[in-house]
Amino acid sequence: ARIGLKQGLLMLLSGQKCGVRSALKKGLIDEIVPKAILFQVACDYIYGNTPALRNVKNRYQKWVLKRENITWFRRYLIEQIEQQVWLKAFDNYPATKAILTLFKQRQENQPSAESECFAKLFQDKTSKVLRKVERTNREMRHQYHDLQDAGEIKKVAVLGSGFMGAGIAYITAARASLPVRIKDINPDGVQKALRLSYLLLQKEVELGHLPYGKLLQKIYLISGGERFIGKQRADIVIEAVYEDLQLKQNLIEESENYYDNDTIFASNTLTLSIAEIASKAQRPQNVIGVHYFTPVNQRRMVEIVPHQTTSQATIAKAIKLVIEQGQVPLLVKDSPGFFINRILIPYLLEAYYCVLDGEAVGTIDRALQEFGFGIGPLAMIDEMGLDILIKALPKLERCFGGRFAPPKKVDNLLLNDRKGRKNRRGFYLYHSRTGDRTQVDKSIYQVLEITVENNLEPEQIVRRCILMMLNEAAYCLQENIITNQNEGNVASVLGMFFPEFRGGIYAYLDEIGAQTIVAELMLMVEQHGERFQPCEWLVTRAAQQAEAAA
């Protein structure tokens, strides 16, 4: 065995992708050679003109591999890995169960058994759904391969050094290999942003995804300070500051006065209209929305939001940058909340309503994780920042009504200084040094003045939260926020961790059916109020389905 049972099984079960340097480090491959001499080196290995192929390096590794071949230990190891996988996948992926079964059985004709298993899984519904999502993902990346209007991008500036600004700077340097300048009036914030980038790059080195020699090359691409440096040298300026229209307009003015006439200004706003932000610009055709999601290095979806007078060259250059950063672009209509947050926020709020109704934080998050989400809704609120979410609600409520009304007692959380991961205080407790989520902060119930009763079944919690999301997704189609449902499916998977094996938000909507959704929403209206009122698009589609079935 090259890497042993444990490592090999974990790679198979997670579907982990492995770069060549990581593969060399793990022992999956023997050598990395230049393309020009690849054939010759391969021949040397075949004919024995080189040292023996990679073997176990030390006595400890030999002992580990020998131990893994002991029957009782092998069985114990597989059971432990099975428990780990179940905690993450919750039996939602048939392939994981099939792989574990094959490893347990250890048949004599193992290759034949694996081939039969693969053939069955390939025809499975989950496999077809996953392949469709991946195919659409690739299409979204490649449909913009010929961006003739984009021009060359040589340097990027980021305004704001918070988690968002730091994340944008990191992917610009690490993935796009572009120089990036972080500007912020707070020097400490800039230092934290630079440190975050260094830690993320260091992690890439540890995982074998980045050669150590390139770490310093990447980190030297990032600079920061209180002022712009490099007269007229930024091709794109990305603002990642808090939601204040006047502030964003002032930043446009400052950037326009400093940089060239063709410099693009990209706003990372959550709720403000891009047209409003651009209304006082000298060159509104250069203003566009480019909306990332926290944590930027993990959430690969980026919304591209042009307003009515945004030029095609600006759109092309924004899309080009996003693709170079390794992200997936989604063109959306200029409307508060855009697409991802528009469907995400009602789902998050409903989870909070469940807390107010006496459900435990851990129970709610676990129920949605068993449904297939990579992270529970309340943990996601902590990631987003409770203060940011609450500040966005009044604007969204004015535009879309009571579905976005601030729930009761949210002020209690703000007064208790609970902003989530960024200040280590939220629905969860966080490690003081690493910032990793540890456990539910049970004092949250006292702050909200509630008693945990856990009256709801997990299925009821899931139904309440998912119905709000499905209804809002239908509103987005009704209002032409997006026009392609397949792209909406990929966006929901990449942007908010909607279960990939369910095919995305619109695939799941079609699976349940508009008739069922409308009926359940009307029942929820009776139980919980008007926020569950089904949208016209759903009602019309339900009527059409009923008529077709008659």
Label every model-predicted segment.
Residues 1-550:
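N-terminal glycine-rich phosphate-binding loop for ADP-containing cofactors
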